[in-house]
A protein has these predicted regions:
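Conserved phosphate-coordination/catalytic loops
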Residues: 100, 155-162, 248-251
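Short amphipathic alpha-helical interaction patches enriched in hydrophobic/aromatic residues
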Residues: 89, 93, 149-153, 265
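Von Willebrand factor type A / integrin I
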Residues: 1-33, 42, 51, 170-174, ...
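Short, electropositive alpha-helical surface patch
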Residues: 132-147, 259, 286-287
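Short, contiguous clusters of charged residues that form electrostatic/catalytic patches at enzyme active sites
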Residues: 104, 108, 159-166, 255, ...
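Von Willebrand factor
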Residues: 141-176, 188-190, 210
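An amphipathic, basic-hydrophobic helix/alpha-beta surface used to engage anionic
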Residues: 1-130, 135, 177-180, 187-188, ...
Length: 289
């Protein structure tokens, strides 16, 4: 994509998503994600009713009387966007590509973050870590992120969510809120990595998918190509049995995915490319309040 085209698209996305974050998500984002981390504030003398687990034994020994550590809600968050850039995101049959919706959702979350004085960073991943953008504040930083979202060219077309989660756990030393934006087509189990990551951080899953992945249209013979492996096959979509089998496969896959999120205690939301992601995000925020 030419530089002028990229800049034009960056501007278009900024106008749309910044408006959403300012006018619709302002209070919702704050209440959904603020106050989930605690930081040390001060030490004071023990008072009746204080939790004995908060006693600072070093200070207590020094002054020969019990002192406790006082914590307060962290006033700013570090937000990480974990963006799937594998080949399957370059797919879309209705309205827009999955990649385009992921870009808009990521930009909306980014503007919501800086509006609340939070730092925002990005992990682009396929079956490897493609790029890590360290968390920072500011509009200039957000515009750089949007530009990367629009024009990023991954080295690999495959996906490995487990690897991305392990990277998050290792590279982010302090607690953060991490949004995974993916179609979650990855077949490899990532439940253990997700559980471990969510113990250290606040992980939220955002699934973006195309309607034709869940429901095949009855259009006769159709050639299907796996965007990640390149494997092709022909199927007869005029057959009700074929369409039903595909639908059953999708339902089973979604059931397993939702089970993974539930067992890992991770909030998740799914949205189709022909649906309104604003409503999906508002539902997610409401779930967390």
């Amino acid at each position: 994509m030419e530089t002028s085209e990229i800049l034009k698209k960056v501007r278009q996305i900024e106008i749309k998503t910044r408006g959403l974050s300012n006018n619709i998500f302002a209070g919702q984002y704050h209440s959904a994600f603020k106050g989930r981390g605690m930081s040390f504030s001060e030490v004071r003398e023990y008072q009746f009713g204080d939790d004995i687990r908060d006693i600072d034994w070093n200070v207590t020994a020094r002054f020969n009387k019990p002192y406790v550590k006082v914590f307060e809600e962290e006033r700013e968050l570090t937000v990480m966007l974990m963006v799937d850039v594998s080949g399957s995101l370059e797919f879309g049959t209705i309205k827009q590509l999955k990649k385009d919706m992921v870009t808009e959702i990521a930009a909306t979350l980014a503007f919501s973050a800086i509006q609340n004085n939070d730092k925002i960073g990005v992990i682009f991943f396929s079956d490897r870590i493609e790029e890590f953008i360290p968390p920072k504040k500011g509009r200039k930083h957000i515009l750089y992120i949007i530009r990367e979202l629009i024009d990023f060219q991954p080295e690999s077309r495959r996906t490995n969510i487990r690897l991305a989660l392990e990277y998050l756990t290792n590279v982010m030393k302090r607690r953060c809120t991490a949004f995974i934006l993916s179609d979650f087509i990855d077949q490899e189990s990532f439940k253990n990595a997700l559980t471990i990551a969510n113990r250290k951080h606040d992980v939220v899953a955002l699934q973006v998918y195309d309607r034709r992945v869940s429901d095949l249209p009855p259009v006769g013979l159709m050639r299907i190509k796996d965007a990640e492996t390149g494997h092709e096959q022909w199927i007869d979509t005029s057959s009700k049995a074929v369409r039903r089998a595909h639908r059953d496969w999708w339902i089973q896959k979604q059931t397993e995915l939702n089970d993974t999120f539930t067992k890992s205690n991770v909030d998740a939301v799914s949205v189709r490319t022909d649906q309104d992601y604003v409503k999906a995000l508002l539902n997610l925020f409401a779930k967390r309040n």
